[in-house]
């Protein structure tokens, strides 16, 4: 199994610098998968349709499917980054990109 490699990534955001665009409903474009990684702290990832929520922690990254409308709610101090893929990323529990 070949693990997809991200083609890009967001800046690293904290609870202060997280842009309003990510705090409000938005979505990735067609063909783009997101992988939300927490470096510290946690966020609530809220999907709109179908409605669901996921707690994202440093041990539990979250996959964001193409065109899935969602937003992020910081739960206290945190740092996070989103990686972007052209195919569904693999969740490897012990992956450490350094």
Summary of predicted features, one role per range:
Residues 50-67:
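Short acidic-glycine-tyrosine-enriched beta hairpin
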């Amino acid at each position: 199994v070949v693990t997809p490699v991200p083609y890009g990534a967001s800046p690293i955001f904290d609870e202060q610098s997280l842009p309003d665009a990510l705090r409000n409903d938005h979505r990735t474009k067609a063909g783009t998968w997101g992988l939300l990684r927490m470096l510290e702290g946690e966020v609530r990832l809220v999907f709109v349709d179908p409605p669901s929520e996921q707690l994202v922690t440093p041990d539990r990254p979250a996959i964001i499917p193409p065109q899935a409308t969602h937003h992020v709610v910081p739960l206290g101090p945190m740092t996070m980054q989103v990686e972007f893929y052209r195919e569904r990323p693999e969740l490897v529990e012990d992956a450490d990109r350094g």
